[in-house]
Amino acid sequence: MSAPEPKITPELIASHGLKPDEYQRILDLIGREPTFTELGIFSAMWNEHCSYKSSRIHLKGLPTKAPWVLQGPGENAGVIDIGDNQAVVFKMESHNHPSYIEPYQGATTGVGGILRDVFTMGARPIACLNALSFGDPSHPKTRHLVSGVVAGVGGYGNSFGVPTVGGQTRFHTRYDGNILVNAMAVGLADADKIFLAAASGVGMPIVYLGSKTGRDGMGGATMASAEFDEGSDEKRPTVQVGDPFAEKLLLEACLEIMAKDCVIAIQDMGAAGLTCSAVEMGAKGDLGVELDLDAVPTRETGMTAYEMMLSESQERMLMVLKPEKEKEAEEIFKKWGLDFAIVGYTTPTKRFVVKHGGQVKADLPIKELGDEAPLYDRPWVESPKLPVIHARDINAPMGAAEALEKLLATPDLCSKRWVWEQYDHVIGGNTVQRPGGDAAVVRIEDGPKGLALTVDVTPRYCEADPFEGGKQAVAEAYRNITAVGGKPLAITDNLNFGNPERPEIMGQLVGCLKGISEACIALDSPIVSGNVSLYNETSGRGILPTPSIGGVGVLDDFTKSATLAFKAEGEAILLIGETKGWLGQSVYLREICGREEGAPPPVDLAVEKRHGDVVRGMIHAGTATAVHDVSDGGLLVAIAEMAIAGNIGASLDAPPGETVSHAWWFGEDQARYVVTVKEADLLAVKTKLKTIGVPCTQIGVTGGHALKIEGERTVDLKALRHAHEHWLPDYMGGKN
């Protein structure tokens, strides 16, 4: 006999994240008081994490279509066609709240979840990336969080057998109480063998696959839809526990069963577990679903229907199976040592029915749970415009050489080698360009093609001007893919914001989305998948708006990709793009001048596209020997990174006479690249760029073992490398 269910009270409703008007909507919808299990189901499906109820109305404006897009948003991952019947499947997703509470497990299950999203579509994962945002280094929890998250990301990816090839790591005090862990996975599939989540056919068996269900992860999706407070550590039991070795078995079993043509529809059990996967499959297929929880494999005794429906135990899948393939499918999963259980059937009723112990625990309309969940048009206000900071109004407290050394040893600009060396970035043998460059390059087996992969966003720009910040995030992803020789094709996004019930926060989201949309259209890079993470606040203090952009591009010949390292002495250093010396929101202004203010640099998308096409053409023609986009830290930081990577110095000319020196070296004007060319090609390159109207300035020549800046003191490369490489390991070792 099952234990009596709790009485539905206002306190119980509130603890499930449901507001009074939402509960009233439930009463109106079903005409009675919900059962405890039904309350849990509504809580899971109507929370922000699963329903996107605050953002969905604005997401509809994003460009999602192109001739090469095979599957846009709405499925487990996006899919693009890269020719030769090959498709790239990719998505980015957050695991922010769990990673703050339990950094190792939060990060591992974030990686595991995004990998499942990719191989659920029928793709074999070939690469992972991430975007990590931590609090101020001086905060007492930051070092612990960095250590746990990085170990978790590496621990899962390394054990599963997928290389982690790139990403971002940043620090800012606004992430003190709410770090961000955004994970991206990329896979390859046959373009004509993509598997979707929509069920079809009445009476089809619904099969539970993978690991057993436990009580870990209870209420995880609801936790991810709420602000933190001082008692957040008490939510540790809601963090899931991952097993990468079980996931590897699940991957191989799923790909084998797909190859045997057993699958009608398949969905991974991620947020809200069995509830979300079953509802989505039925709702997308315009069918009902009936589940018998007595058949669910469990690893704990006495689990209730509520617990089984809301558990977020990892490494699980739900599949609608072709009936005639039942025995064959079961044999495959048993071979891999995984659970295989028929737990229900599709029905024509459009109802979601859950049975346990011979009793009906839930009987709800499935469409209203799924794709017809509440939709809010929340009030929003536009972010106020900040004044433009003029370079001549900023006094330089030190020379360019000294400022460069200081900047290279700051948390955001220092080398992240300590992070990525903990990841196996070459497992599989297809990594062409490792972390540390503009974009990762991964070879596609059995051919010359490669993929260029990157993750980008500049949150301080997004806070200062959400529209320009949204544009810039897409533009930088475009530049980074271009800088390695890739043709940008599509984007996945991960929108991390604070409390959407505050109009100023909602305004940030709306502004960023408008900027992202405009940039995607101009740069011909549709958004094919994504994730929204709201309520990233602690005690009323929100994070910086952080719309992470994951970019994917293709190279026809991966052997012709470019890198940022200087290749030889005596090569001309060219700056492509115009420099006005934009210091507003720059790293220089913050770290050297102690000011975090002003309007961010504007983004001219037509110029971005024109300059990108030119640089890509130079790479393909073989005239560009090294390429690096200019972003955080400005021109001199970009040159220093190229010199350090190639172990070759440079002699640099003084800034043009009309330019303020520190603005020339450290301004963060957009649409710029540093390119090196051989002396023999220099005249032809400069002539061509002048003819087509693309700004090109020769700013120096490679050579030696130092940076020699006209009018400044010389800086030895060893000193620059020490500054660049030592800050993070020293910090993690407690030395600073």
From Swiss-Prot:
Localisation: Cytoplasm
Biological processes per GO annotation: 'de novo' IMP biosynthetic process
Enzyme's top EC category: ligase
List of residues binding Mg(2+) 2: 117, 268
Residues given in the record as substrate binding sites: 94-97, 116, 240, 312-314, 533
GO molecular function: ATP binding; magnesium ion binding; phosphoribosylformylglycinamidine synthase activity
Main localization, broad class: cytoplasm
InterPro entries in the cross-refs: PRibForGlyAmidine_synth_PurL, PurL_linker, PurM-like_C_dom, PurM-like_C_sf, PurM-like_N, PurM-like_N_sf
Active site location: 49, 95 (proton acceptor)
Transmembrane segments: none
Keyword line: ATP-binding, Cytoplasm, Ligase, Magnesium, Metal-binding, Nucleotide-binding, Purine biosynthesis
Annotated binding of ATP, by residue: 52, 91, 493, 530
SUPFAM superfamilies: PurM C-terminal domain-like, PurM N-terminal domain-like
CDD domains hit by this protein: PurL_repeat1 (cd02203), PurL_repeat2 (cd02204)
Gene3D superfamilies, alphabetized: PurM-like C-terminal domain, PurM-like, N-terminal domain
Top-level division of the source organism's lineage: Bacteria
Record keyword Ligase present: yes
Record GO cellular component, one term: cytoplasm
Pfam short name (any one): AIRS
Assembly, per entry: Monomer. Part of the FGAM synthase complex composed of 1 PurL, 1 PurQ and 2 PurS subunits.
Described purpose of this protein according to its UniProt entry: Part of the phosphoribosylformylglycinamidine synthase complex involved in the purines biosynthetic pathway. Catalyzes the ATP-dependent conversion of formylglycinamide ribonucleotide (FGAR) and glutamine to yield formylglycinamidine ribonucleotide (FGAM) and glutamate. The FGAM synthase complex is composed of three subunits. PurQ produces an ammonia molecule by converting glutamine to glutamate. PurL transfers the ammonia molecule to FGAR to form FGAM in an ATP-dependent manner.
Protein known as: Phosphoribosylformylglycinamidine synthase subunit PurL
Organism of this sequence: Rhodopseudomonas palustris (strain TIE-1)
